[in-house]
Amino acid sequence: MNLQIEMEHHRGVLIVRLSGELDHHTSDMVRMQMDEAIQRRQCEHIVLSLKNLQFMDSSGLGVILGRYKLINQKGGEMAVCDVNPPVHRLLDMSGLFKIMPIYDNEVNALTELEVVS
């Protein structure tokens, strides 16, 4: 399976929706596209929706942590939402939720980042 990336900008937030598999085959593409979007659009925050992400390995984890560090260095926040059980387990075991909040859906994430219209 491959990976689809959908990106949207909403009031200073880069919303990234991933579908498919985030692994060593697709992680570089995600990293490059997110970095370009962050630099080009001057995003303050990131919301990462994993609703349709079927699988993720340590390469995917690295992409998420790297984007977290990047946006954090700019004074922004990153949140994860819509995480399915297998991916949730990996993120939980990695300790990611100790540094990054998780929300049930995009609306809740945007509300917490105080950018809902």
UniProtKB/Swiss-Prot annotation:
Keywords: Phosphoprotein, Sporulation. Gene3D superfamilies: STAS domain. Phosphorylated by SpoIIAB on a serine residue. InterPro entries: Anti-sigma_ant (IPR003658), Anti-sigma_F_ant (IPR014237), STAS_dom (IPR002645), STAS_dom_sf (IPR036513). PANTHER family: ANTI-SIGMA FACTOR ANTAGONIST TM_1081-RELATED (PTHR33495:SF2), ANTI-SIGMA FACTOR ANTAGONIST TM_1081-RELATED-RELATED (PTHR33495). One of its GO terms (molecular function) is antisigma factor binding. The gene is spoIIAA. Residues 3-113 form the STAS domain. The keyword Phosphoprotein applies. This is Anti-sigma F factor antagonist. SUPFAM superfamilies: SpoIIaa-like. It holds the Pfam family STAS. The modification Phosphoserine is found at S58. Belongs to the anti-sigma-factor antagonist family. GO terms for biological process: sporulation resulting in formation of a cellular spore. In the phosphorylated form it could act as an anti-anti-sigma factor that counteracts SpoIIAB and thus releases sigma f from inhibition.
